[in-house]
């Protein structure tokens, strides 16, 4: 007969079973301790975003009593709609629902934007931690989470760091298609981001990564080892988990080496895939770093009227054309918020 003491400890406690379930690798979807934080924050951000995108009233984004409509119920469509950033009247103040005198005031001042952005930021950081956690439990290396840190850094730059540097959440990127375009145009006007070296590295990372991905995929697809007849798809010959190579890396290496030159092609599959991961990740890191420095007005290069002839007359360059375009965009945005051509805020 089992004693009461042994019977008490024979069945694990509810907390112990919960901990085992959270950390279990046998779940269809891994939860993890970062997932315990990720799930409620991302669900909150997604729910509030959907509701606000559909039905939020106009927001006084500039703090001058001129509300901007962003939701579908107030005349927008999928392209023009957005969750409008928190009002400039709020600035960087923490603005939860209980800080407003009423729900209408909270909505008028753009409270949903701050709620979404803060929960979203915690959620994506938790997702990155969850990637590391699952990799650790499976005995894998941690580079999946490191790669994901690039989009996390980019989102943090436009939603958190830039508003902090500019002094108001109203300067954050709107949560919508046209709002994103407006953010990009105003960012160019105020910071000349196209002339910033870190943005150039980001462009090289994104477009270069796309090029390298397309090149790698097409080379592999073109050098598959056929395991089927001519009447069957070549893809049928692959069995998940097979030990044999699925493509001829020697043939792919030889083709690319002859197409360009010998040392342009990788002869090591591991170094090749490391390069494919590193190139876009480092580029996006630099872009995020550039946006974060421009948040504090360390802007792109300004070569305004830098080329002159022997008589001192200006010879216009494309840099001068860009500067003229920047001035045009600058004077047209927030045109009722200030009385000077340049934004003196």
Curated annotation (Swiss-Prot):
Supply the alphabetized keyword list. Calcium, Chlorophyll, Chloroplast, Chromophore, Electron transport, Herbicide resistance, Iron, Magnesium, Manganese, Membrane, Metal-binding, Oxidoreductase, Photosynthesis, Photosystem II, Plastid, Thylakoid, Transmembrane, Transmembrane helix, Transport
Write down the Pfam families for this protein, in alphabetical order.
Photo_RC
Q: Quote the PROSITE patterns the UniProt record gives.
A: REACTION_CENTER
Residues binding chlorophyll a ChlzD1: 119
Q: Which GO terms describe its cellular component?
A: chloroplast thylakoid membrane; photosystem II
Residues bound to Fe cation: 216, 273
Phosphoprotein as a keyword of this entry, yes or no, is: no
Catalysed reaction(s)? 2 a plastoquinone + 4 hnu + 2 H2O = 2 a plastoquinol + O2
Cellular location(s):
Plastid, Chloroplast thylakoid membrane
Question: What does the entry list as the binding residues for [CaMn4O5] cluster?
Answer: 171, 190, 333-334, 343, 345
How does this protein sit in the membrane?
Answer: Multi-pass membrane protein
| Disulfide partners | none
Annotated site location: Tyrosine radical intermediate: 162
Cofactor-binding details, from the entry: The D1/D2 heterodimer binds P680, chlorophylls that are the primary electron donor of PSII, and subsequent electron acceptors. It shares a non-heme iron and each subunit binds pheophytin, quinone, additional chlorophylls, carotenoids and lipids. D1 provides most of the ligands for the Mn4-Ca-O5 cluster of the oxygen-evolving complex (OEC). There is also a Cl(-1) ion associated with D1 and D2, which is required for oxygen evolution. The PSII complex binds additional chlorophylls, carotenoids and specific lipids.
Where along this sequence does the record place binding of pheophytin a? Answer: 127
> Which residues carry the site feature described as Stabilizes free radical intermediate?
191
Q: Report the function annotation for this chain.
A: Photosystem II (PSII) is a light-driven water:plastoquinone oxidoreductase that uses light energy to abstract electrons from H(2)O, generating O(2) and a proton gradient subsequently used for ATP formation. It consists of a core antenna complex that captures photons, and an electron transfer chain that converts photonic excitation into a charge separation. The D1/D2 (PsbA/PsbD) reaction center heterodimer binds P680, the primary electron donor of PSII as well as several subsequent electron acceptors.
Q: What quaternary structure, including any partners, is listed in this protein's UniProt entry? A: PSII is composed of 1 copy each of membrane proteins PsbA, PsbB, PsbC, PsbD, PsbE, PsbF, PsbH, PsbI, PsbJ, PsbK, PsbL, PsbM, PsbT, PsbY, PsbZ, Psb30/Ycf12, at least 3 peripheral proteins of the oxygen-evolving complex and a large number of cofactors. It forms dimeric complexes.
- Similarity annotation: Belongs to the reaction center PufL/M/PsbA/D family.
- Its name, as the record gives it, is Photosystem II protein D1
Organism of this sequence: Euglena gracilis
Tell me the organism's taxonomic lineage. Answer: Eukaryota, Discoba, Euglenozoa, Euglenida, Spirocuta
């Amino acid at each position: 007969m089992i004693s009461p003491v042994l019977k008490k400890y024979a069945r694990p406690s509810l907390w112990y079973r919960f901990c085992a379930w959270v950390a279990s690798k046998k779940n269809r979807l891994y939860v993890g301790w970062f997932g315990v934080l990720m799930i409620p924050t991302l669900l909150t951000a997604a729910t509030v975003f959907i509701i606000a995108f559909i039905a939020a009233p106009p927001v006084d984004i500039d703090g001058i009593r001129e509300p901007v409509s962003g939701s579908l119920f107030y005349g927008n469509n999928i392209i023009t709609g957005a969750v409008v950033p928190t009002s400039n009247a709020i600035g960087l103040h923490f603005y939860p629902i209980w800080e407003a005198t009423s729900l209408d005031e909270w909505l008028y001042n753009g409270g949903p934007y701050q709620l979404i952005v803060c929960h979203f930021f915690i959620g994506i950081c938790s997702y990155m931690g969850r990637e590391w956690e699952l990799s650790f439990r499976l005995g894998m290396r941690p580079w999946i989470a490191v790669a994901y840190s690039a989009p996390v850094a980019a989102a943090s730059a436009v939603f958190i760091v830039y508003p902090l540097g500019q002094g108001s959440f109203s300067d954050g990127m709107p949560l919508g298609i046209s709002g994103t375009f407006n953010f990009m145009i105003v960012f160019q006007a105020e910071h000349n981001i196209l002339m910033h070296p870190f943005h150039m590295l980001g462009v090289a990372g994104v477009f270069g990564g796309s090029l390298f991905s397309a090149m790698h995929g097409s080379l592999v697809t073109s050098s598959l080892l056929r395991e089927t007849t001519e009447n069957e798809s070549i893809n049928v010959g692959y069995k998940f988990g097979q030990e044999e190579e699925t493509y001829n890396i020697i043939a792919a290496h030889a083709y690319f080496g002859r197409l360009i030159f010998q040392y342009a092609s990788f002869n090591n599959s591991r170094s090749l895939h490391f390069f494919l991961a590193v190139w876009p990740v480092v580029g996006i890191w630099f872009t995020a770093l550039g946006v974060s420095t421009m948040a504090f007005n360390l802007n792109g290069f300004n070569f305004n009227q830098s080329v002159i002839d022997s008589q001192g007359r200006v010879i216009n360059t494309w840099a001068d054309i860009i500067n003229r375009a920047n001035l045009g965009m600058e004077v047209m945005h927030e045109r009722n918020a200030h009385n000077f051509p340049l934004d003196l805020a």
